[in-house]
């Protein structure tokens, strides 16, 4: 008995995407790498890191140790990117070094744009900026508000500007995260550790400044969502909760740690940490979005501030337990 072979054509499988993450071992970049790894299990992830070494990132990606301003661009031909997540910033510890980093970042980004524009197939680029770019506000702002950078963003703007000005790339998208709540960075340095050290949770200035918050994992989820569901050449505000006052935020921390809250004056803050830090911690930038349907697609894990705090404090306790 002869059987007729099945000649019905089958669709060729879609090629696995290649994602690049610049700043892949940094605070946001590492979270983006993890989100890509979980969402796209068959993708090729090229993680570019500098200074920091992260074993998990090195194990689960094609890891390249490279400086943003001194990069071997032959890697772009070896692993042609479909999308680049730009989470890399040249940092500085004071106004002088931040200004120098800003100039170096500008030169580096101009070179990256030149190299990417010369590829046979241009990738989309998702640049991670921040809501400090919009400056202090009197009411909730949505995407498209004019830039008026304060604090760290005053220095970052120069480095970012080539991506805003370029006509050489066809698709540059923007992520503007609000306050990113995770077990490290500003939360640990300015709230958690001072609370344990001083016996009270600080709030800065009068405490009335409004904070829009997003959990680190939800931040990365939304940044990747800009690639998956976003529109070319569009910027998106990255946040989760309705804005709350910093005093209320401090009180929520105090309730969990069993501590009272107390103010630290803006003058005292500036005297100790400098103008840039003081501007950031006393900033009033409540954000919303004009892209409601995109936002609804994101399915956030921590949509309320109390859930964010519970998760982050649990993560901190886990880290401290491992260190003990």
What are these model-derived regions, one by one?
Residues 170-174, 178-210:
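NAD(P)-dependent short-chain dehydrogenase/reductase
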Residues 47-53:
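N-terminal Rossmann-fold cofactor-binding loop
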Residues 2-4, 8, 303-324:
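Amphipathic terminal alpha-helices
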Residues 136-175:
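Catalytic helix-loop patch of NAD(P)-dependent Rossmann-fold dehydrogenases
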Residues 53, 57-115:
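NAD(P)H-binding glycine-rich loop region in Rossmannoid oxidoreductase-like domains
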Residues 220-277, 310, 316-324:
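Mid/C-terminal beta-alpha module of Rossmann-like enzyme folds, strongest
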Residues 110-152:
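Conserved Rossmann-fold NAD(P)-dependent oxidoreductase catalytic core, especially the SDR/UDP-sugar
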Residues 13-41:
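N-terminal Rossmann NAD(P)H-binding glycine-rich loop of SDR-like oxidoreductase domains
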């Amino acid at each position: 008995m002869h059987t007729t072979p099945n000649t019905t054509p089958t669709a060729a499988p879609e090629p696995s995407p290649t994602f690049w993450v610049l700043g892949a071992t940094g605070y946001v970049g590492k979270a983006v790498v993890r989100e890509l790894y979980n969402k796209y299990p068959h993708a090729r992830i090229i993680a570019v890191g500098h200074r920091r070494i992260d074993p998990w990132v090195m194990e689960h990606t094609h890891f390249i140790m490279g400086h943003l301003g001194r990069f071997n661009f032959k890697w772009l031909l070896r692993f042609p990117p479909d999308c680049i997540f730009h989470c890399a910033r040249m940092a500085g510890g004071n106004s002088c070094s931040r200004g120098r980093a800003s100039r170096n970042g500008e030169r580096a980004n101009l070179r990256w744009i030149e190299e990417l524009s010369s590829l046979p197939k241009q990738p989309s680029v998702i640049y991670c900026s921040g809501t400090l770019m919009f400056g202090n506000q009197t009411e909730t702002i949505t995407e498209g508000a004019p830039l008026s950078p304060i604090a760290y963003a005053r220095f970052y703007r120069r480095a970012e500007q080539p991506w805003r000005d370029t006509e050489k790339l066809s698709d540059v998208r923007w992520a503007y995260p609000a306050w990113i709540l995770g077990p490290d960075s500003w939360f640990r340095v300015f709230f958690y550790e001072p609370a344990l050290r001083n016996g009270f949770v600080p709030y800065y200035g009068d405490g009335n400044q409004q904070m829009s918050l997003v959990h680190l994992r939800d931040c990365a989820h939304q940044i990747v969502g800009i690639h998956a569901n976003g529109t070319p050449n569009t910027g998106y505000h990255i946040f989760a909760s309705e804005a709350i006052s910093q005093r209320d935020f401090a009180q929520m921390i105090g309730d969990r740690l069993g501590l009272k809250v107390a103010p630290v004056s803006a003058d005292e803050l500036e005297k100790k940490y400098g103008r840039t830090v003081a501007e950031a911690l006393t900033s009033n930038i409540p954000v919303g979005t004009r892209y409601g349907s995109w936002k609804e697609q994101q399915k956030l894990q921590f949509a309320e501030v109390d859930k964010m705090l519970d998760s982050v404090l649990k993560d901190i306790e886990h880290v401290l337990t491992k260190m003990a």
